[in-house]
């Protein structure tokens, strides 16, 4: 039976997943001193980044421009601030499930500044993930918010676009920001169906940006 054709059941399932995500996310204090992803931490030098455990290095601006490793970060084009964006994934030989963040297939981008230090990290749920996994993608944002402390977030809700419809009775366009321990965080969550999408197609995503906070 296709759940997407049963809005009530689908909505109940989404709410249940959301409750589980919140319940299983550990509480955090309003200071954060851990790594931001695995062994990656904002501010660390690029030459300190571990090569083992990571694969598929490429320039985010042109993913056909492959890199041998972190050490080749200067081969990618810099933006106006001198920051270079490196796409990467997890080595399947050490990460059996592939590039996953908190159980969600993810697209990862590391930002390195012109001094050779990690300036930021971007995490996006993978839109090519299988449907049964992808329809939980909006929950990753809840897990990210809990990781950095549930308090102190400033959130806003976007207005529906022309013809946009809820999915399973839920419409979500949320953007939340927070600054903590020298990190500027942005968590965006979307769940809706555009007018050009059929019953099995919809927007369901989380985008997370972790940058060094400006003084």
Where on the chain are the PLM-derived regions?
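Positively charged, low-complexity intrinsically disordered regions
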Residues: 4, 19, 85-88
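Mid-chain, structured segments of secreted extracytoplasmic proteins
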Residues: 71-121
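Generic hydrophobic-segment detector
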Residues: 2-3, 33, 106, 110, ...
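Non-cytosolic coordination micro-motifs
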Residues: 24-75, 114-215
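C-terminal segment of classical bacterial N-terminal signal peptides
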Residues: 15-23
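Bacterial N-terminal signal peptides that target proteins for export
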Residues: 1-12
């Amino acid at each position: 039976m296709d759940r997407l054709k049963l809005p009530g059941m689908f909505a109940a399932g989404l709410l249940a997943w959301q409750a589980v995500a919140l319940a299983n996310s550990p509480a955090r204090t309003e200071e954060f001193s851990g790594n931001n992803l695995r062994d990656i931490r904002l501010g660390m030098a690029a030459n300190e980044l571990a090569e083992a455990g990571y694969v598929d290095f490429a320039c985010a601006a042109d993913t056909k421009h492959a890199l041998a490793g972190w050490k080749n970060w200067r081969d990618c084009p810099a933006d106006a601030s001198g920051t270079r964006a490196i796409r990467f994934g997890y080595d399947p030989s050490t990460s059996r499930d592939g590039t996953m963040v908190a159980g969600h297939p993810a697209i990862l981008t590391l930002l390195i500044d012109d001094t050779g230090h990690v300036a930021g990290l971007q995490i996006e749920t993978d839109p090519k993930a299988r449907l049964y996994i992808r329809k939980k993608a909006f929950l990753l944002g809840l897990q990210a918010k809990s990781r950095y402390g549930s308090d102190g977030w400033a959130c806003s809700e976007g207005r529906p676009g022309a013809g946009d419809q809820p999915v399973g009775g839920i419409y979500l366009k949320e953007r939340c920001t927070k600054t903590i321990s020298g990190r500027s965080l942005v968590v965006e969550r979307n769940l809706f169906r555009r007018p050009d999408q059929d019953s099995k197609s919809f927007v369901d995503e989380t985008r997370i940006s972790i940058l060094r906070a400006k003084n």
